[in-house]
Amino acid sequence: MNVEIVEREESKTAGFHLVGPWEVTAPEGFDKLVAWTSKHNVMGPWMGVYHGNPRAVPAEELKIETVIGVPTDFELPEGSEGARLSIIPAGTYAMNLVHVNDGDFTKPWYAFFDEWLPDSGYVMAEGPCFDHYLNDGSQSGEWDIELYIPVSKAE
């Protein structure tokens, strides 16, 4: 696992916020995002922002934002019902570049938390985890994704 510690500035995002099991809400949210970005010709980096620990929070209470990164002065276009603006906080993040080709987007996350984090010298900090999709693998099934965990030095 090749993890880098990076400093990220605050990022403004636009997209959809859903609550429920991620295996249901992530595809639903990205379908909504595809339709919205196509309708309004909006482009930007694609991300999933995750709120809640799936090992501690009941699946029906997990939250996800399916979003694109937008400029700081971006405003939602007319006819954007259901879309919202959000902020990914600035901070220190552990970033892991992964390749997914089997449709299992959870496996690299669990490996990141279970294999890297415990002996890394870092602990998870306040804030959401998120992933940044570097390509559209919807046709090929091949995805390159940056996974981000907010971290601080362990004491």
Curated annotation (Swiss-Prot):
Pfam (any one): GyrI-like
Alphabetical list of InterPro entries matching this protein: AraC_E-bd (IPR010499), DNA_gyrase_inhibitor (IPR050908), DNA_gyrase_inhibitor_GyrI (IPR024911), GyrI-like (IPR029442), Reg_factor_effector_dom_sf (IPR011256)
Keyword terms, alphabetized: Cytoplasm, Stress response
GO annotations of cellular component type: cytoplasm
SUPFAM superfamilies, A to Z: Probable bacterial effector-binding domain (SSF55136)
SMART domains documented for this protein: AraC_E_bind
Superkingdom of source: Bacteria
Membrane-spanning parts: none
GO molecular function: DNA topoisomerase type II (double strand cut, ATP-hydrolyzing) inhibitor activity
Protein location: Cytoplasm
Family to which the UniProt record says this protein belongs: Belongs to the DNA gyrase inhibitor family.
Description of how the protein assembles with itself and partners: Interacts with DNA gyrase.
Stated role: Inhibits the supercoiling activity of DNA gyrase. Acts by inhibiting DNA gyrase at an early step, prior to (or at the step of) binding of DNA by the gyrase. It protects cells against toxins that target DNA gyrase, by inhibiting activity of these toxins and reducing the formation of lethal double-strand breaks in the cell.
Protein name as it appears in the record: DNA gyrase inhibitor
Classification lineage: Bacteria, Pseudomonadati, Pseudomonadota, Gammaproteobacteria, Enterobacterales
Name of the gene encoding the protein in the UniProt record: sbmC
